[in-house]
């Protein structure tokens, strides 16, 4: 369960990076230079700093692709977990459970799996509290 939480936190972190605001491109920097007619040394330093932002765009592209790969693998894992949970919980065959899960959207599958693990962890915590208070 700890690994699942850590993986979920990593997925959220990559999502934040991928969704962040894109940096200014070199084309936009050229427009700024033309508009402001930069002659001052400080402005030239500022433009050099902004030119380095193109590296950030490449990094953001890498994290965006990595995020898509991680999300795809997480979706596959959740699909398998949802099938296993349905087989165990509802007592149906694996094929029937697979058909039910295939009919669900990715969002519904995620919610189903997270809801199951949330109930499971809260019931374990509740049992620990009840047992510790009874003695």
Curated annotation (Swiss-Prot):
Keyword Secreted carried by entry: yes
Tissue spec. comment: Expressed by the venom gland.
Secretion signal, residue range per the UniProt entry: 1-20
A Pfam family this chain is assigned to: Latarcin
CC per GO annotation: extracellular region
Domain of life: Eukaryota
GO BP terms: defense response to bacterium; killing of cells of another organism
Propeptide feature ranges: 21-60
General function of this protein: Insecticidal, cytolytic and antimicrobial peptide. Forms voltage-dependent, ion-permeable channels in membranes. At high concentration causes cell membrane lysis.
Family from the record: Belongs to the cationic peptide 06 (cytoinsectotoxin) family.
Name recorded for this polypeptide: M-zodatoxin-Lt8q
Species this protein is from: Lachesana tarabaevi (Spider)
């Amino acid at each position: 369960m700890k690994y699942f939480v850590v993986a979920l936190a990593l997925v959220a972190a990559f999502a934040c990076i991928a969704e962040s605001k894109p940096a200014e491109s070199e084309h936009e920097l050229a427009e700024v230079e033309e508009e402001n007619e930069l002659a001052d040394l400080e402005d030239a330093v500022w433009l050099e700093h902004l030119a380095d932002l193109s590296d950030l765009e490449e990094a953001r592209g890498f994290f965006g692709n990595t995020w898509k790969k991680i999300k795809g693998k997480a979706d596959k894992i959740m699909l398998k977990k949802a099938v296993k949970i349905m087989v165990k919980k509802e007592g149906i065959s694996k094929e029937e459970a697979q058909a039910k899960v295939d009919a669900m959207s990715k969002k519904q599958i995620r919610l189903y799996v997270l809801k199951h693990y949330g109930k499971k962890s809260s019931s374990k915590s509740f049992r620990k509290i009840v047992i510790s208070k009874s003695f």
